[in-house]
């Protein structure tokens, strides 16, 4: 596979281990490979289990495989490579590999996580010799005689009982035909005797007269002369189908299968896990899902803080809401106030349970850390009535408002153009659906059906911003 070959050429000098993978598209939720080019890039980061720090991003090549571009017998999926580093010649099984596939014009970025344990266990298994080779030592076969060597050395392939008379006749006949062994010619006597015209063995063993320069013996015919390569291209290796070995692995976070591609017999069997050096008491303190739980808890905490800020704003305004968008409520509810209250209560409950890495507040935090501007919209369905949209970037021709006041939302709605021109109104005109408008200033507004808006805010420390940008930044 060309992608595996190129990744190996570009990255194998800067990493300790490189794993070549084929990942099925259904394992990468939200990939939409049909909207991407056949060859594209993705970003790889590693989250260290012990320090919870994220490595520098590495951009690797990926390819959508099909019937024309296959990996062995595989005709679908995404082929890519993962360059990895060791720590003191050991690897931690619970480090997390974070793959980020960039957003497209119509879809958000998507993330896939792998444990070191999954990848390295596959490498070790693939690098180990087959079981039959371990249990059954190789059988030594008796050496086979080469008839050509026998002819050059003056031996006959058929052996007869040797008598003094037959021995003398054989020796005499041999001397008459080819002479002594030391003066034997390598070319026919009717032709020129110079070996330079017919080729010579390495080192000019025979002189121009045809006699040997070495005393007593002719080099064996099966000895090959040493050749020195003119060009040695270190770091270039073409992976072919004949070298390929596919090893199925299971993605432990989803239970789906993907494939490890082994092209060369590298010695991965000597890779050592750092857990091998820990005592039994130390092993009991390890939580394999620590990083996953911390990231999920962090996202949930931020959403809870936002909902708390909404409730504080409502209490400060004595639970009075203002309608900022002139949208009628499309509902058969007899009491509009009770209807809006019901939508608000369900919105608070849903927001506390909803976490998404493509949420507008995540993109706003990344923009704040990198000193960029932007406005994003999250459309969230209530009562599980549909599928929402996360982190929709709103393009504005004029300078972006900071969304500090209600007037900013009205101004923003008037500036939207193209496919987003009536986006806010269309979202607020539907039942069982809410929207959250996010700004790079970390202000956020909850938009309810009917165009009612409540102001909230996300509060991030410097450590929080670094945490978000290191994981979800480009």
UniProtKB/Swiss-Prot annotation:
A GO-annotated cellular component: viral capsid
Keywords, ordered alphabetically: Capsid protein, Host nucleus, Late protein, Viral genome packaging, Viral release from host cell, Virion
Keyword Membrane: no
Pfam family, one: Herpes_UL17
Regions crossing the membrane: none
InterPro entries, alphabetized: UL17-like (IPR007640)
Localization of this protein: Virion; Host nucleus
GO terms, biological process: chromosome organization
Function according to Swiss-Prot or TrEMBL: Capsid vertex-specific component that plays a role during viral DNA encapsidation, assuring correct genome cleavage and presumably stabilizing capsids that contain full-length viral genomes.
Quaternary structure note: Interacts (via C-terminus) with capsid vertex component 2/CVC2.
Family indicated by similarity: Belongs to the herpesviridae CVC1 protein family.
Entry protein name: Capsid vertex component 1
Organism from which the protein derives: Alcelaphine herpesvirus 1 (strain C500) (AlHV-1)
Gene from which the chain derives: CVC1
């Amino acid at each position: 596979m060309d992608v595996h070959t190129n990744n190996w050429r570009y990255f194998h000098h800067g990493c300790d281990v490189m794993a070549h993978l084929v990942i099925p598209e259904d394992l990468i939720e939200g990939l939409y490979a049909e909207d991407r080019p056949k060859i594209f890039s993705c970003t790889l980061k590693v989250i260290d289990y012990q320090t919870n720090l994220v490595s520098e991003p590495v951009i690797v090549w990926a390819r959508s495989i099909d019937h024309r571009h296959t990996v062995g017998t595989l005709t679908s999926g995404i082929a890519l490579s993962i360059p990895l580093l060791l720590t003191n010649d050991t690897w931690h099984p619970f480090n997390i590999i974070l793959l980020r596939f960039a957003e497209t014009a119509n879809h958000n970025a998507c993330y896939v996580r792998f444990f070191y344990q999954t990848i390295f266990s596959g490498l070790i298994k693939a690098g180990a010799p087959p079981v039959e080779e371990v249990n059954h030592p190789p059988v030594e076969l008796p050496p086979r005689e080469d008839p050509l060597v026998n002819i050059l050395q003056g031996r006959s392939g058929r052996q007869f009982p040797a008598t003094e008379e037959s021995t003398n006749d054989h020796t005499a006949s041999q001397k008459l035909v080819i002479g002594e062994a030391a003066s034997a010619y390598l070319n026919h006597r009717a032709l020129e005797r110079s070996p330079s015209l017919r080729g010579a063995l390495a080192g000019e063993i025979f002189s121009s007269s045809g006699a040997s320069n070495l005393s007593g013996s002719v080099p064996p015919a099966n000895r090959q002369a040493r050749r020195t390569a003119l060009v040695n291209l270190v770091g270039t290796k073409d992976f072919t189908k004949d070298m390929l070995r596919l090893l199925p692995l299971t993605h432990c976070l989803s239970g789906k299968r993907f494939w490890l591609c082994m092209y060369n017999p590298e010695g991965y069997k000597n890779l050592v896990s750092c857990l091998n050096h820990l005592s039994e008491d130390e092993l009991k303190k390890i939580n394999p899902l620590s990083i996953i739980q911390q990231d999920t808890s962090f996202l949930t905490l931020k959403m809870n803080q936002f909902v708390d800020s909404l409730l504080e704003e409502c209490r400060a305004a004595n639970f009075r809401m203002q309608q900022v968008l002139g949208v009628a409520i499309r509902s058969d509810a007899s009491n509009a106030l009770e209807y809006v209250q019901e939508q608000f209560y369900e919105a608070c409950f849903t927001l506390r349970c909803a976490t998404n890495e493509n949420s507008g507040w995540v993109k706003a935090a990344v923009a704040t850390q990198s000193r960029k501007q932007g406005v994003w919209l999250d459309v969230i369905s209530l009562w599980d009535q549909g599928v929402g949209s996360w982190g929709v970037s709103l393009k504005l021709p004029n300078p972006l408002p900071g969304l500090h006041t209600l007037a900013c939302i009205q101004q923003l709605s008037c500036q939207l153009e193209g496919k987003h021109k009536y986006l806010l109104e269309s979202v607020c005109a539907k039942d069982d659906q809410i929207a959250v408008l996010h700004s790079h200033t970390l202000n956020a507004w909850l938009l309810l059906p009917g165009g009612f808006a409540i102001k909230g805010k996300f509060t991030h420390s410097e450590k929080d911003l670094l945490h978000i940008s290191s994981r979800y930044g480009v």
